[in-house]
């Protein structure tokens, strides 16, 4: 329930489906109300609906048949309290809660997923005519009676779309599960609290009991505010997953308002803090455990059910997706086109700096603690390493910001600024790794020495609530990891490594700071959450040493963000751009501050904007990111045989393809335009990758069916089946509507890889084989890379003719590649295909990333590619031990 719709009379159209949607007149004339549209294009006025609390518990609202059943189910939980043994009651309510929670996440989840992908619920309604007044079946009548009991006797079921009526019934199913889930959880809380003579108020000091109750109640009230605010924002339509069934018109994108502007997915994140408030009040690890269990299942539900549907309905278009892919890959151009090491993530064994980082991390995190004599020495090492990292990084960033010392040194030594930035990223990450490895090593040493002495709690500032401390500590550590990855996802590796300090702004495609991702909610998410993992370690091991480390991490983080990064970002983007309110700030001002204070703050902000002295805020600039199968092995084996001294004859390949079995058949397939390897008759015919293949067919007129069809296959995948094709053609097929005809296989109808292939004629829309063509080979064209750049134009023309023209259409060798390639459904796959064809044709291996690291003004042309290949050849020849022995890279 995270669809953030602006109001009930608006929603979002899927840009991929709009062109196929036709809008008809409303089926029910209603004077007022939001307008809805089904996925088939039928429009209607959406009647008013009420939330589940009002419909179930408001005595002034008439109850429908299903609602009475739901209330009966809810009150039936009271029967469990007739059992005198409280422990048995706890077990029963836990079992009931697990049942309803699984029904929610996997029952409702399954229905919604299939409704989203296959329109399942609506199809059921149509299949069984559930809303047809003429259907007198028991199920249909009960469903229709339920609809009328909800909407009133005057409600015309047939005049409303089946999608809306199906949604009304689905809502009751949701009400039953959600309310039962919550009620059984509350029963677990109550039974756990009164266990052992009301243990939740016993065996603790007076102030601690009241602190728990007050804090827990605060969490519950905050949870209630989140739910109410969310419902007021998204209304019943999104609360009950309405856009799985139909859409509401006039809302073009997701709206971030209210609590949805405060945190991502509030219904699933902060929308469950009340569960932990109940656990705190009940003073029960059992309640805490089932709260974690329920919350975890909700996050799975969000990830696998809601997010895919949100992306499908509200997500970016194909062009936007292609752009995002390209920009994320462009972010790597400063790091040699490889994801840089962040911590130990993106580790690459072929990168020396990664191996050094791993060795140092293991040394400081494990080896040194194993041989250390005292915790004091480990503490000194950790503090020293943190001070060294803080001073060196902060000083380097300050000098670079004000004096550009790194850039000046790099340019004076003819080192590209991108390379100097890459070196800085390695240094920065290495120092960060050393500080966290030292911190981990200090705590490992503490654990080993205390375990060896037989005392596990000695030296701790407090030792109570161990399991709670571990849970909260691990939660804080996880939060830091999540925040860090969210930051990288929003601003890229460029922003993570302070790219604004090293790369000129004029060389970037983005001129403004990002307000996407986690930065939508917080201006500086790393201000606190960037070091909350250290706080988590302190909670788990609350020692003086860890407390000092927390102070060091927090102070350094505060100084770096507020006194170094902030001033640099203001210089780049200006104070007004940097100091805009975050989502959390806006929400607090709008919902939690009195109106008088809001007006006063608005006046102050207007004054400070005029005078250019807004409060401090900073954000890094975004870099505009928001085993081969057995058959393939056989194919490679055939190719290897062909290239070996023992040639595989055409006759043997024909036998392998079983073409001879159809020599006397009345059906015929002939392939036009194939070339001969040589004048020898036993050589296999071939064509080149991407070249269209024309196949002609002849079939007996009396036996011909318009559903006869031809498919293209690898012979190594079909050689075991002569009379029936079991393998899918994967779209490489065409109908044979006439007894005689021809068809050109090109583009997606072709295989774009080397191998030996055949065409198969199938009968009457089935997979029965009537004829198998002669085998033919698809292989790469051979292109020789010239020695000199003077020949680049002629070489580029060959590349255009033999490779590029088969994939994308360019007018000449000087036309930019990217604008044409970006028009495809998957630009990355296009680049991969072109780079693969070039590699096989020229025997110089390149990757698709060559098209992402483009030339001047980001307009890489075929001529530029030709020059790059010539340069690569020169480098390879110079590195070869024998200049006559050309290397295949």
UniProtKB/Swiss-Prot annotation:
Q: Its domain of life?
A: Eukaryota
Say if the entry is tagged with keyword Nucleus.
Answer: no
Question: Pfam families, per this entry?
Answer: PEMT
> Which enzyme class, named as a word?
transferase
Q: Does the keyword Endoplasmic reticulum apply?
A: yes
Spans annotated as Disordered: 606-627
**GO-annotated cellular components:** endoplasmic reticulum membrane
Q: Which terms does the record give in the GO molecular function aspect?
A: phosphatidylethanolamine N-methyltransferase activity
Q: Provide this UniProt record's keywords sorted from A to Z.
A: Endoplasmic reticulum, Lipid biosynthesis, Lipid metabolism, Membrane, Methyltransferase, Phospholipid biosynthesis, Phospholipid metabolism, S-adenosyl-L-methionine, Transferase, Transmembrane, Transmembrane helix
Which pathway is this protein assigned to? Phospholipid metabolism; phosphatidylcholine biosynthesis
TM segment ranges: 64-84, 92-112, 174-194, 206-226, 262-282, 285-305, 355-375, 378-398, 424-444, 471-491, 528-548
Give the membrane topology, semicolon-separated if more than one. Answer: Multi-pass membrane protein
Q: Where in the cell is it found?
A: Endoplasmic reticulum membrane
What family is it from?
Answer: Belongs to the class VI-like SAM-binding methyltransferase superfamily. CHO2 family.
According to UniProt, the name of this protein is Phosphatidylethanolamine N-methyltransferase
Classification lineage: Eukaryota, Fungi, Dikarya, Ascomycota, Saccharomycotina
Gene that specifies this protein: CHO2
